[in-house]
Structures are given as C-alpha cells and as structure tokens.
Amino acid sequence: MDIIGGQHLRQMWDDLADVYGHKTALICESSSGVVNRYSYLELNQEINRTANLFYVLGIRKGDKVALHLDNCPEFIFCWFGLAKIGAIMVPINARLLREESTWILQNSQACLLVTSAQFYPMYQQIQQEDASELRHICLTDMALPADDGVSSFTQLKNQQPATLCYAPPLSTDDTAEILFTSGTTSRPKGVVITHYNLRFAGYYSAWQCALRDDDVYLTVMPAFHIDCQCTAAMAAFSAGATFVLVEKYSARAFWGQVQKYRATITECIPMMIRTLMVQPPSANDQQHRLREVMFYLNLSEQEKDAFCERFGVRLLTSYGMTETIVGIIGDRPGDKRRWPSIGRAGFCYEAEICDDHNRPLPAGEIGEICIKGVPGKTIFKEYFLNPKATAKVLEADGWLHTGDTGYRDEEGFFYFVDRRCNMIKRGGENVSCVELENIIATHPKIQDIVVVGIKDSIRDEAIKAFVVLNEGETLSEEEFFCFCEQNMAKFKVPSYLEIRKDLPRNCSGKIIRKNLK
C-alpha cells in the first residue's frame, strides 16, 4: 500500500494551507527570546516567497543549495521552498568549521549558500581561497557586507509574490535533500533523501507517537539533523499539529518552554535528560501537558526511572539513523514497553539480527542489527555519488546493514548492545574516530594517534586522544587542544590527552582500541 498517494512536498504544503488555513503551524523562539508565529496559510506563503527568491537567483530543479543556519524560521522556509521548485537542500551542521564545511560544499556541488552573519567570514574565505561551485551567498541578517555575490535573504524574499512562480514537474522519487552524516570512514557521506522519504517520515513518525492536529510538538534538536526534520517537523506538519522550534537547548529554560507553549510531545537525548536532572528541583517540575517524550539511545534504567518520576513523563524509545530516515525500531503507540528494549520493528519494516555471514540469528544471540525497507521510500535512496559506499551497506533487496550490534527476545523486542565501529556518540552528535585521527595526525610533532570514546556521565561519551610523539619532541596540553580547536568543530575536540611511547596493536598492525578504553 502506498500511503503517500503520489503527493510530493509541493502538493503537501498547498493542501495543508487549504485544510488548516489560519491554524498555527510553526512557532520559532530565538536564543534572545524573540518569538515568530506562522499559520499554515502564512507559512505556505513564506515558503512560496522563498521558492521565488531562489528562482530569481537562478536556482532550478536539481540544483543544490546549502544551508548553514541555527534553528530559525528561515531554515523551514528554505527547506520547503527548495522542495517546491525541485531543488535540493544540503544542510550543514552549524557547528562545523571551514575545512569540514568546504568539503561538504565541494562534494555536494552546492552552487548557493544561505547562512547568517556569524558564519559569513568563514564562507567569504572559502569563496576566495577554495575550489567550489559556490557562486552566491544569501545572508539572513539585515546588515550586508559590501561584497559582490552576496544578497539579503529577507529583503529579497519580501520582494517576492506569495504565489509560486516556477512549478516544474515533480515526482515523489525526486531528491529533496542530501544530508551529510558522519560515518566510520574519514569523511561524511551524503545521504540522499527523496520527497517520498520525507512524506513517509511524516506519516510514520506521526503514527509512532499517535500525533493529532491538536498536539504541540516542541523540539530543541538542531534543524540540520534527521531527528528534527523527520521525527519532529514532518510529523507535526503531516498531522496538522503545531511545531515549536527552539533555537538552542538550555536546561534552565527547557521546562519553561514546554509549559509556555503547552507542548504535548517533545524529544530528548541522554545529554538533555542528565542536564535536566541536575537542575534544582521545582514545584513546577510536573506542571506540563507532555504525553510522550521521544527518546534516543542510551540511558541506564536508574537514570530513566529517576527522570520519569521527577518530571512525571514517560519515554517512547526510538532507534534509527540518518539512513533509515525515521526510528525504524521503537515503542509502538498503545503497546507495552519493555525497558531497556529499543522496541519492535515499525510498520513497513522488517528487522533481523544477523551474523557475520548475513544469516539470521535466533533470539538471545548478539549480531548486527539489519533493517529491510524500500530504498528511496522508507529508507534512504543512496549515498550521493558514492556507489561503493552504498553497496557496502545497502543490498539490492532493501536490506540495510546498520553496523550496530544487538539482539532480540522471543517476543520480537530488540535490544541495542554497541554503536557502530569507530563512532563516538557525544551529546547527540556522531563523531568519527578516523576523521579526528586524520586531522590530529597533521600536527608536526605527532607520530601516531588514536582516539576513543570513554564513558561520560553527561554527554554519553567523552573523546580521549592517545598520541605518540616524534623522537625528541614535547607537546603541552595547551598546544594540543589549541591545535584541535583550530581544525575541527568544537564538539569534536577531545576532552583528554594521553602521551604514550607506543600504541597497542595486533599481529596485523591494527590498533587494539578496546585496550585503551
């Protein structure tokens, strides 16, 4: 059964505006406390104006446009404005620095960038010094630098009509987004997401938390992440609910925001739960309307019980990754929950635990978590311009190898055991060990390097670097951490450094990481 019915994102927004009209669709709260509200009709008009803006700037169907933005209304306008004209959004993690952002620009073939003043100096350098197809920058801030190839997003948008000027033929199979995600290799891979993927994600995630049009879904997750886009935004809009997008997470402000907007659904990662628990207890801790808290790995039973008891909430566990688009294993609406299980396979999916030879394992045995979906529909289509990487994880019949290990019980409940090889989960961000090692290895004093994740009570894992220096060299912690801060995003910078004479290796010469944890 095709639950999408051939409807692409342009049709979705036109229908939503007709059906829900003046009902509140989007509320955005900035870090400074500025609140913007849009009805479904108003939001569709802003999306149309943004689509027309891109058309005026020469963007056509199939062109790629990068977004380097914090959570803001403009992200939503651009996301769906691009989709309406068949162009492709390339969201960039707002915490990435020049080298990482340049790589994504070059490998996505983005020809236009929408960003804010805080990130502009970095992209000005990229335009001047690095090879890329970037030919124009739109700044969301009102003040503009006196540079060629730069325009004001807001001024240009406000000059556009509220009806769509360019409407090329669209298919649900068309690419809507290329989302670069950290992998076990040295560089991120571009996950190709179609119109069908996003439409399906909306229906599926709305089903997962039994979302209704009178619900209010609040998130502090970054808009460039799949969680915000597919678990929250697409779910809320598909159900005709209200979507509340907060610019940045603050443990002190979170419950006040939940209460102020009368949120009924929200989503949390372990770092949020732990930081909320260290806030001073308040008589208002349970003064909210939350029905469900969508939760993503990984928390102890003691932490879960303490959080649920203090705040009077229950967690709805969901397991997935960028490639699966949604939480393909999770708790089901109205179904029993079995902590610490990550739940059962959702509708439209099959899940198996497989051995190293891709054979299904019986209940209780640990193996790789494998998921079967339909590429380009219920799971990602492919890695952008990377057929070799695609073939490594995605079989022709739709089986996806997650690289994560787990097991299932006799009733079909799945349990997560370990994260995919060489990945560190740090406060909601996936960090590739290999990527960090390649950067740190460029330091002239360092001969050998390995980074590992170690347990952290707040952020799941902290990053520790083990280095071997060149003969006769010395390296201070200050010099090392300064080098890292200059060459990688802040969330990737190691927290600890240990200088060693050598690193443990097996007979093949590979470093034995488990000996360093």
UniProtKB/Swiss-Prot annotation:
PANTHER family: ACYL-COA SYNTHETASE, MEDIUM-CHAIN ACYL-COA LIGASE ACSF2, MITOCHONDRIAL. HAMAP family: CaiC. Pathway: Amine and polyamine metabolism; carnitine metabolism. Belongs to the ATP-dependent AMP-binding enzyme family. It holds the Pfam family AMP-binding_C. Its EC number is 6.2.1.48. Transmembrane segments: none annotated. InterPro entries: AMP-bd_C (IPR025110), AMP-bd_C_sf (IPR045851), AMP-binding_CS (IPR020845), AMP-dep_synth/lig_dom (IPR000873), ANL_N_sf (IPR042099), CaiC (IPR023456). Keywords: Ligase. It comes from Escherichia coli O81 (strain ED1a). Disulfide bonds: none annotated. The keyword Ligase applies. This is Crotonobetaine/carnitine--CoA ligase. It comes from the Bacteria. One of its GO terms (molecular function) is medium-chain fatty acid-CoA ligase activity. Catalyzes the transfer of CoA to carnitine, generating the initial carnitinyl-CoA needed for the CaiB reaction cycle. Also has activity toward crotonobetaine and gamma-butyrobetaine. The lineage of its organism: Bacteria, Pseudomonadati, Pseudomonadota, Gammaproteobacteria, Enterobacterales.
